[in-house]
Amino acid sequence: MYILTNILSIISNDVPTPYALGFQDSATPNQEGILELHDNIMFYLLVILGLVSWMLYTITKTYSKNPLPYKYMKHGQFIEIIWTIFPAVVLLIIAFPSFILLYLCDEVISPAMTVKVIGYQWYWKYEYSDFVNSNGETVEFESYIIPDDLLEEGQLRLLDTDTSVVVPVDTHIRFIVTAADVIHDFAIPSLGIKVDANPGRLNQVSALIQREGVFYGMCSELCGTGHSQMPIKIEVVSLGKYLGWLNEQ
C-alpha cells in the first residue's frame, strides 16, 4: 500500500533538471497563466508552421505542371489582402491575452504580509517588515549559497542556501525588491516571479502560493563574478508551522 501511494502521489518539479525542455510545475495563478499562454502561442505557431510547410510543398510540387503563365502577372489583390489580414489577426489573438496576463502579474492584491528582498554582491538579504522579534527588531536575515564542500546528502548544488525564506501557504504575499550595489534579479520560475532589483528603486510583485513545498530560484541578471552564487530558496509551509518558525526568530 505504501508503494502504491508513492506511485499515485503527485511529485511536483520545482527545481531545474538536467536537459529539461519544459517549465517547472506552477504553484501560483500567475505561473499557471504563463504556462497556458505559452501553450496557446505554441499551438498557433505549430498551425502556422504546418500551413506554410504545406503551401511550400504544394507550390514546389505543382509549379512545373501549372499551364498558366503567371510570370506576367504583376500583382494579386486577393492574396495580398489575405497575407496582410491573416498575420494581423494572429498577432491580435496572441497580444490580447498577453496584455491581460501582463497587467494581472503586476497587480498587488491586498497583501497579508510583506517580505523585503535586497540583493548584494553576492547574496540576498530578507526583511519581514510586518513582524518584530523579542528585542523589538525587524525579523531579518542574510542568505548565502552553501559551498560544494559543505553540501549534505539531498542538498542541491548551486541552489541550496544556509537560510531560506519561510512563508505560509494560500496567503497573498508581497515581495518588495531592491539592490544595494548593482542590478540583480529576483526570479523563482515555479512561482512565476521575475523582478529586477535596482539600486535606489523599489519594485514589487505579489504571489499567492497554492501548495506547500520548497521552491528554488536564482539571480537572473548578470551582476559580477559571483552571479551564479546567488540562489533563492523559499519554503512554503502551513500557517501553524509558519507561526512556529516566526516565534523562533
UniProtKB/Swiss-Prot annotation:
Which residues does Cu cation A2 bind? 219, 221, 223, 227
Keyword annotations for this protein, in alphabetical order, are: Copper, Electron transport, Magnesium, Membrane, Metal-binding, Mitochondrion, Mitochondrion inner membrane, Respiratory chain, Translocase, Transmembrane, Transmembrane helix, Transport
The UniProt entry's sequence similarity note says: Belongs to the cytochrome c oxidase subunit 2 family.
What protein does this entry describe? Cytochrome c oxidase subunit 2
Q: Return the GO cellular component terms, semicolon-separated.
A: mitochondrial inner membrane
Tell me a Gene Ontology molecular-function term this record carries: cytochrome-c oxidase activity
What cofactors are annotated for this protein?
Answer: Cu cation
| TM regions (residue ranges) | 40-60, 81-101
Q: Where does Mg(2+) bind?
A: 221
List the disulfide bonds in this chain.
none
Native organism is Vanderwaltozyma polyspora (strain ATCC 22028 / DSM 70294 / BCRC 21397 / CBS 2163 / NBRC 10782 / NRRL Y-8283 / UCD 57-17) (Kluyveromyces polysporus)
Per UniProt, what is the membrane topology?
A: Multi-pass membrane protein
Write down the Gene3D superfamilies for this protein, in alphabetical order: 1.10.287.90, Cupredoxins - blue copper proteins
Per the record, the gene is COX2
Matching entries from NCBIfam families are given as:
CoxB
Database matches in PROSITE patterns:
COX2, COX2_CUA, COX2_TM
GO BP annotations, alphabetical order: ATP synthesis coupled electron transport
**E.C. number, please?**
7.1.1.9
Its job: Component of the cytochrome c oxidase, the last enzyme in the mitochondrial electron transport chain which drives oxidative phosphorylation. The respiratory chain contains 3 multisubunit complexes succinate dehydrogenase (complex II, CII), ubiquinol-cytochrome c oxidoreductase (cytochrome b-c1 complex, complex III, CIII) and cytochrome c oxidase (complex IV, CIV), that cooperate to transfer electrons derived from NADH and succinate to molecular oxygen, creating an electrochemical gradient over the inner membrane that drives transmembrane transport and the ATP synthase.
What main location does UniProt list?
mitochondrion
Pfam families attached to this UniProt entry = COX2, COX2_TM
